[in-house]
């Protein structure tokens, strides 16, 4: 489970406690977010991505990215309309449109292609899915860096997506939850960096991973003013926003030095290195991700072809025989079959322990005798 074990920055927790002691904050807040927080989001986007946002009409606070995304689908889609969702995917991306009565067309991700080839094939499949669906889809849902596959894309990729969306009158919703958990020489862009993107796109940004504030339920939807105002109107009937002290603490987080975020990402980078290199040493070759807090691993062929295991059976095997919990790929859709997802939410000693457990479990099955 992608539930960070790293605590939030101490100064953010201190601010929460300080404000929570004040009597006047214990009441309903604003569903759209207090003005200072929306301004802090706009300033953060300017510094981080070079994107200009109007705090009044292009920024809204959401009670976590899942809530924001789900209600955005409710604000955008009606029965009989269709969303395109790449798969495998974070489950709510696929099911929120269905919950609101819309249809979903899956776009299988070409997971094993390198970035340039991935971009070309993704766009080819997007064109194919869009044009083979009648009436044409209304929304494209994307998320890069991607959960669970850890796929990353360039700004050029977003340019092509926006170009396609404008040409075909398609809305784009981009979940940018892992924008700040990146490694090596890669820096994830925002889709709103594309000129004219706000004409067709909304982006979700969360503090859960960037500031290790999972459970605080603080996220934002930013971008197209029509969609943001529709979401504001909908949420005004549904909720009273996030507890005010949490909003004030979020302001402090967003206004802090970016090194705070990078220090959190460096912890995940070290864990990534230990896990991927450890798996490689025991004969399980896994691609090293450039972003997210996950490792997406293809199950060795010995287990799928010789032992006949699917991803759920293999996950149970690792749990019972190695004492290691992973997410079966099928849990992210049928296109995730044959893969498992590791979450980098344990320290380096625990990761080393996990590698030893997996090696022992592999040995019991005859994996190494078979040349694994």
Predicted regions and their residues:
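PLP-dependent enzyme catalytic core of the Aspartate aminotransferase-like
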Residues: 127-128, 305-309, 317-326, 331-372
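N-terminal small-domain helix-loop-helix segment of the aminotransferase-like
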Residues: 1-64, 71, 125, 253-256, ...
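Conserved glycine-rich beta-strand-loop-beta hairpin in the small C-terminal domain of fold type I
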Residues: 251, 266-276, 286-300, 336
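Conserved core segment of the aminotransferase class I/II
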Residues: 193-194, 198-269, 273-282, 361-362
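Conserved PLP-anchoring active-site segment centered on the Schiff-base-forming lysine
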Residues: 75-97, 124, 128
């Amino acid at each position: 489970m992608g539930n960070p074990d790293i605590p939030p920055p101490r100064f953010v927790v201190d601010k929460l406690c300080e404000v929570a002691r004040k009597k006047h904050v214990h009441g309903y807040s604003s569903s759209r977010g207090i003005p200072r927080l929306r301004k802090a989001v706009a300033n953060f986007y300017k510094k981080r991505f070079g994107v200009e946002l109007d705090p009044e009409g292009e920024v809204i606070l959401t009670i976590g990215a899942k809530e924001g995304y789900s209600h955005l689908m409710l604000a955008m889609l009606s029965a009989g309309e269709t969303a395109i969702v790449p798969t495998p995917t974070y489950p709510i991306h696929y099911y929120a449109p269905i919950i609101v009565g819309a249809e979903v067309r899956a776009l299988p991700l070409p997971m094993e292609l390198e970035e340039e080839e991935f971009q070309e094939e993704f766009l080819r499949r997007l064109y194919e899915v869009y044009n083979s669906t009648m009436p044409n889809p209304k929304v494209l849902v994307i998320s890069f860096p991607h959960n669970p596959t850890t796929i990353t894309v360039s700004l050029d990729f977003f340019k092509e997506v926006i170009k396609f969306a404008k040409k075909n009158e398609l809305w784009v919703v981009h979940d940018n939850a892992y924008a700040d958990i990146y490694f090596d020489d890669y820096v994830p862009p925002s889709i709103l960096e594309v000129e004219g993107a706000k004409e067709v796109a909304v982006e979700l940004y969360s503090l859960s991973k960037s500031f290790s504030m999972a459970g605080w339920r603080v996220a934002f939807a930013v971008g197209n003013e029509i969609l943001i105002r529709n979401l504001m109107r909908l949420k005004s009937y549904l909720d009273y926003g996030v507890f005010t002290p949490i909003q004030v603490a979020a302001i402090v987080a967003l206004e802090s030095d970016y090194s705070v975020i990078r220090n959190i990402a460096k912890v995940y980078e070290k864990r990534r290195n230990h896990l991927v290199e450890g798996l490689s040493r025991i004969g399980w070759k896994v691609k090293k991700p450039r972003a997210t807090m996950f490792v997406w691993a293809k199950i060795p062929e010995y287990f799928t072809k010789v032992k006949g295991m699917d991803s759920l059976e293999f996950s149970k095997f690792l749990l019972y025989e190695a004492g290691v919990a992973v997410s079966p790929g099928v849990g992210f859709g049928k296109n995730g079959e044959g893969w498992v997802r590791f979450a980098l939410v344990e320290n380096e000693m625990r990761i080393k322990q996990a590698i030893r457990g997996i090696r022992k479990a592999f040995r019991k099955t005859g994996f190494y005798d078979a040349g694994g």
